């Protein structure tokens, strides 16, 4: 909820700062904020393709720079923190920790120093402990711990949440949202998932991986619920913004249905994919490309089958659309943007 004395109407007239504004979720969020008639300060580190041409105030800000964060957030009562280093086995730990830990710490401290009225912190489903694998994941599940088997992305997102909650105890009004794997339009970079769909469309996936799946959610549904979290979310609360679980094979088949892509018939068992992951990673490095899958990403695709977004549905009205609609709109956007050639 908004702090006492701050109405939704008055808040809608105030400046909103968005870190990671040019990313996949960020560019969709910025568009939705503008559609509400709000003033947006878009914080970006380098690339601006996701927000080029939009009527926003663009500010260059590396979130690993504490002073830059304070300057960039000054005068913005509402902050959405999306800047993150998403990595499932393709980046060394240092850069991931610098952004997801150091960057979040800097943003939180800047929010406290600048008197921000509400922070909406974007975490991830990965922030929650993967064990037990077959258990239902909801907001009551413990955060991932710093254990030898914990993936660096999971650990840093969990620790980022702890930093936000520590700031809440110090007086910061913040709410946390935890999306699952996001798919949808305005995927300029593209994202890892968007790149996988493009590669499948181009026929560069020799085989699909059996025994793998995840929870997939439309980026626009994530944004809509995050906007609701700003105005309706409880201070210090977490909200799982998830969609529908589908195996990777089922997702690829649905992608083929909406795009006309020829989907590989060969389905490799998980053990074979895991054995080949190091070779895929090495070949990708030689080509200067991000690997389509890694040992870590395959491990992720065996977890998180049972996820509940009941809390977000009840409190924020979260209502994920069918994946076929998401994939159809994603295909249409990729085609219009010239990313399928």
Regions picked out by a protein language model, each given a short descriptive name:
Residues 14-36:
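N-terminal Rossmann NAD(P)H-binding glycine-rich loop of SDR-like oxidoreductase domains
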Residues 98, 102-153:
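Conserved Rossmann-fold NAD(P)-dependent oxidoreductase catalytic core, especially the SDR/UDP-sugar
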Residues 148-175:
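Active-site Tyr-X1-5-Lys
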Residues 170-176, 180-214:
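NAD(P)-dependent short-chain dehydrogenase/reductase
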